[in-house]
Design a protein with these regions (language model features):
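Short pre-active-site segment immediately N-terminal to the catalytic Zn-binding motif
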Residues: 124-141
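Short glycine-enriched nucleophile-adjacent loop
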Residues: 152
Length: 208
């Protein structure tokens, strides 16, 4: 076979998706991330096994410390069946006893109703752009930009999400890079494209 023929065949091959190690390697030019990579190894952005449970977890986590959120999640998961039907059937007073605020009880029930009614369909959203998914999710009371971005990362495994709304991310960037405004952080994040979700995983590790 001639060299030109061989090259033509290669040109027609479909693009190969980068391996987890190759994706991580693109972030190593950043010294802060390189140090986190050395410490924590290869991380991956992976879809949740249970999208509804992941959405409930994100709502519980809203504006709470890691320890407080973990304690509430543990009580909630012991008290209620974490399915749309289980949350809808759960007594509001019992959910409050788990440590959920009245507003968060309303939020998890809103999400449960959206799942149960078919208003929120993960399979339908999988084909949408990040912006379209955020618009759809934030139409549900209790889901703001932060929760929607957590869904993009941990339900849909979208690889180029930068959750500047997240306090842990902002703390990590302030400590590691000295940037203090959200606009500065957004600008900084462009160096991590197209793997800003992956970069975020490492940033969280730096402040754990």
């Amino acid at each position: 076979m001639s060299e030109s023929g061989s090259g033509s065949e290669r040109d027609n091959e479909p693009d190969r998706e980068a391996t987890p190690a190759e994706k991580v390697a693109t972030l190593r030019s950043d010294p802060v991330l390189a140090s986190a990579i050395d410490e924590h190894g290869i991380l991956e952005v992976e879809p949740a096994a249970d999208p509804f449970e992941r959405m409930v977890t994100s709502i519980v986590n809203q504006q709470l410390s890691v320890a407080s959120a973990a304690a509430i999640r543990e009580r909630l998961f012991e008290t209620a069946e974490i399915t749309p039907e289980g949350i809808l059937a759960a007594d509001e007073a019992e959910l409050r006893k788990c440590g959920l605020s009245a507003s968060k009880v309303s939020y998890v029930k809103n999400v449960a109703e959206a799942f149960a009614s078919g208003e929120l369909s993960i399979s339908d959203l999988e084909t949408r752009s990040n912006e379209e998914i955020i618009e759809e999710l934030t139409g549900i009371s209790g889901i703001g930009n932060w929760t929607a971005k957590m869904a993009l990362m941990f339900v849909f495994a979208r690889e180029d999400v930068f959750p500047v709304e997240d306090l842990g991310i902002r703390n990590a960037i302030e400590a590691g890079y000295g940037e203090h405004t959200r606009a500065e952080m957004q600008e900084l994040s462009t160096r991590w494209k197209p793997y800003r979700s992956l970069a975020s995983l490492y940033l969280w590790r730096t402040v754990d």
